[in-house]
Amino acid sequence: MKKLFLLMSLMATTVIASATDVWEGTHAVTWDTPLKIEATKFADAKVGQKIVVEFTNATDVIELHSNNVMLPGTRYSQFIKDAGSIDTFITPSMLASLKEHGLEICGKEFTATKIWYGDGKDNVDENTVWTGFFWMDDWKTLELAKTSFDGINWSDYKAIRFCSEANRTDYVINVLTKWGDGGKLGDQTTMTMTPGYAELSLEGINMDEALKDVDRLMVQCNKEGGNAFNFTDIVLVKKETTGVHELSASPTSNTSEVIYNLAGQKVQNPGKGLYIVNGKKILR
């Protein structure tokens, strides 16, 4: 019995040690009186960990801000009536903002009591713009803050992947920037559907223009005839790079550069084909 008690005590100690307290007290949060946490409090935070905000007297919504804008990787205006806490999982861009600007807890009339971060998800992809667990049931909508895409060079990406635990493809999904005309980017009829994710091709979509005059990206799902499921990640999919560059008709303006064929032999007057120049594959 003593051994069992000792084991349980050690397990409890392990759980506690994995959590880092950021702030504790009572702060009446309104839109005019946010709770501000300095950046140094997140010095040891890591991608994939979850930030937990605890509160009481919740009546409406909460938002997480940083540098006076929505914190990248967070949901827009989370309704928290009758709730006691929210979990937010750290993405790469979120971590950068927290470490530089800190955190601001904003919302409508609730009392913040504690903030901490700790164990969350392992192996979060570096191109993840949102991660967490969002329950998709009947026409549920995840609203991701537009700041999650700040600094993105869309020409580097070919798709957006919406990952879930659905393990099926027969559900409805709508990817939207706004309600109404012109707001839909894709749905289950235009996206690539797999048991683990739905993928929106960016071919023909100008994402800079699509996000220009809006404040969020929305993902709406309906479970249809199957079970409800968790939505888990939104990941940008990079274009493949082959390492093959183009060689102009005049192969090089630098006469000191030497052109080799794939067998490692020098070539004086290369025709059409694949060559090696300065250690790079060059296509002529």
Where are each of the predicted segments found?
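Sec-dependent N-terminal signal peptides
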Residues: 4-13
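Residue-level recognition of short loop/turn positions
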Residues: 125-127, 263, 278
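C-terminal tail/sorting-segment detector
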Residues: 2-3, 274-284
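Extracellular ligand-binding interfaces
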Residues: 20-97, 102, 106-238
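Residue-level detector of functionally pivotal "anchor" positions at catalytic/ligand-binding pockets or at interdomain
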Residues: 239-263
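Sec/Tat signal peptide C-region and signal peptidase I cleavage site
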Residues: 13-20
